[in-house]
């Protein structure tokens, strides 16, 4: 036990390309790494997105995963901490007004994304990329 090293990794842009899934080649290498070391993950993404990116096998092999920048913490499938903060209605109205009055015309949907302990706001949005819908 004394020789086990502890490592902390970000997910987006470190273990995976931003907002994409882990590559099959790197999956094999990193899974083995999690078998031999104590691995912790810290990410701004929620648990669902993190599971999509790195797979349940790697996620559950990590000692602890800090989702939503530490506001939603898991050890395997067990939620060990969740920040109960909620977006105040006045702030949500302000963000909606900013969205409504913005002159930026390109919109992808999912502009106000509530997460444990945080909110993600984007005029562009985090919905489907318009280029994905083109044929």
Feature-to-residue mapping (PLM):
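Short glycine-rich anion-binding loops that position phosphate/pyrophosphate groups of nucleotides
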Residues: 14, 71, 126
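Short loop/turn elements that form and flank the Walker-type P-loop nucleotide-binding site
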Residues: 2-3, 36
């Amino acid at each position: 036990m004394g020789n086990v090293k502890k490592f902390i990794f970000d997910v987006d842009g470190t273990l995976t390309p931003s907002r994409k899934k882990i590559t099959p080649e790197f999956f094999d290498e990193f899974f083995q790494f999690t078998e031999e070391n104590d691995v912790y993950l810290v990410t701004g993404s929620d648990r669902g997105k993190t599971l999509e990116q790195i797979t349940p096998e790697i996620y559950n092999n990590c000692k602890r995963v800090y989702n939503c920048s530490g506001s939603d913490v898991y050890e395997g499938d067990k939620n060990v901490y969740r920040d109960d903060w909620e977006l105040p209605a006045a702030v949500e109205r302000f963000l909606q007004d900013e969205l409504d009055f913005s002159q930026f015309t390109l919109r992808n949907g999912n502009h106000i994304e509530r997460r444990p302990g945080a909110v993600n706001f984007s005029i562009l949005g985090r919905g489907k990329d318009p280029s994905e819908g083109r044929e």
